[in-house]
Amino acid sequence: YYYWELLEDSHLKWENGMYRMDMDAFRELIKGCKLFILCNPHNPGGVVWKEEELREIAEICDKEGVLVFSDEIHADLTLPPHRHRPFATISEKARMNSITFMSPSKAFNMPGMTASHVLIFNPALRQRFRKFMEACELDLGHAFAFLSVEAAYSHGTEWLDQCLAYIQGNIDYVDAFLKEHAPKIKVVRPQASYLIWLDCREMEMSQEALNKFFVDKAHLALNDGAMFG
């Protein structure tokens, strides 16, 4: 029951100041797999995947018979001028060979509503998913969740626009502060979401020493980058 032993990590590559998918490695790793979990946009890297990247993923997964789970919970937090492209809209193959998971919980700060939703366009997959949800009694939901989702998506545009502008301001502030006070720590500017990935390689410190530096010197308890690979 240690599920991570069944996983293959598809590592990203560093390219022009941003993480990108290593398609050559992906083609090899995907062979023999049954399922690919896509984080779109990527968390914590903040990458909004390009259409050509998503199209290539769709082609490879269709060829290898691999179902795609597309986690798009950060989609509503895509920062201008970037545009999020839902995986299922890339092609008919992507549409019929994927399950998309979304929720307003990240963008509208409402995880307590347990108001996620799933998009399945393939009728056979949808039926299998429904049977699984019913068997596990996970299909019940509650009325308040439905109302909160409707309110967020119907009346939350102005609030979300202001939220994105505020997030962008935070990113600009952190970037400017580090350039002035800690130039060896580089901000990987996210294209989506409120998470900022800090490149500390120029610090030339071990992971343990780096964690100690942030806690003892900077007085910041941050998520250790090593946990993300």
Task: Say what each PLM segment does.
Residues 63-64, 94, 218:
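Helix C-cap/helix->beta junction micro-motif
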Residues 90-128:
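Active-site PLP attachment segment
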Residues 127-134, 152-175:
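Structural signature of PLP-dependent enzymes
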Residues 143-146, 150, 166-175, 187-200:
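Conserved glycine-rich beta-strand-loop-beta hairpin in the small C-terminal domain of fold type I
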Residues 184-186, 198-229:
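Conserved C-terminal alpha-helix-loop-beta "cap" of PLP-dependent enzymes
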